[in-house]
Amino acid sequence: MRIVVLAGGTSTERDVSISSGLLVSAALREKGHHVVLLDVFTGYEKDIFDVDELFKQNYSFTDSASVGDTISDIDEVRENRRDKTNRYLGENVIDICANADITFFALHGGEGENGKLQATFDLLGLKYTGSGYLGSALAMNKGLTKSVLIQNKVLTPRGEIFNSPEEAADWKIFPCVVKPCSGGSSVGITIVETQEDFKNSVREAFSYGETEIVVEQYVKGREFSVGVVGGKALPPIEIIPKTGFYDYKTKYQAGAATEVCPADITHEQDGIMRSAAEKTYEALHLESYARVDFILDKGNNAYCLEANTLPGMTPTSLLPQEAAVEGIGYADLCELIIKNSLEKYNR
């Protein structure tokens, strides 16, 4: 097949996305596919080119990525764009994707994951991997996610949505968790113990360009993630941070957390989380693949924290680790995601 892998973009998770895109591209090429790796934001900045040659050459906009403990410098990315515009889709992206059998979204956060890009591709009749615009929009907004989970009787921590720091000022439940409403990779998320720290955390959450934040009760317990591929849950993986909680730095720095899969849990606990993950996947109208995060307390209550419609595919990412336990190698997982995604177009 001819496949475009879209990565990069302008979200705070840009570097993670590029790392995912490079690995996905390499894996699909190993499987014999012709793959073009594009930065969704900068695109392919040439006025005259041969699309067929791009696929034959397995063109890639970069051959390296570095995921550090800080987020990407998006202003620098925008400054280096040839046309100097702020449009999300870079030059020639749509034209090249239109010449592919399918586009693999190796994007994380922002317009690549919030349903806007999915809706654009739907309108243009272009095939892509992952959830559609509805599921993407619901899962990207943590406030909407919480509302849908409550309506579908999926356990989730008690929380509220606030539109300004002033609105949040009356929150009295501590410890609590403060989250940007639409961020990913735990960027801007803080666990708060006191009212004074709460004010600072709220300001930080709003500093990421958010118009809403979610504040929820902190649930003490073990942290797990459950991948769902084709509607079926994979084995839960336990995340044990060496310090603090599972934030951006811990997620993408090798050795910052211990990740155990298969997890040291009972058959009952395994079933509780797999069932909740599949129920979340269905309630949020997710498709092809996703990852659902949980806190499991001492009473075996699995609290759903969020769903990720475009899980990371980096060397330290959770979904590939879970798939490996089921005997699904990395390249096979990439092909399975494409197979599951194509099925919705053949219905």
Spans of model-derived segments:
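Active-site nucleotide/adenylate-binding loops and adjacent lid/helix of ATP-dependent enzymes
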Residues: 3-7, 11, 15, 19-22, ...
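Hydrophobic beta-strand scaffold residues
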Residues: 35, 127-128, 156, 176, ...
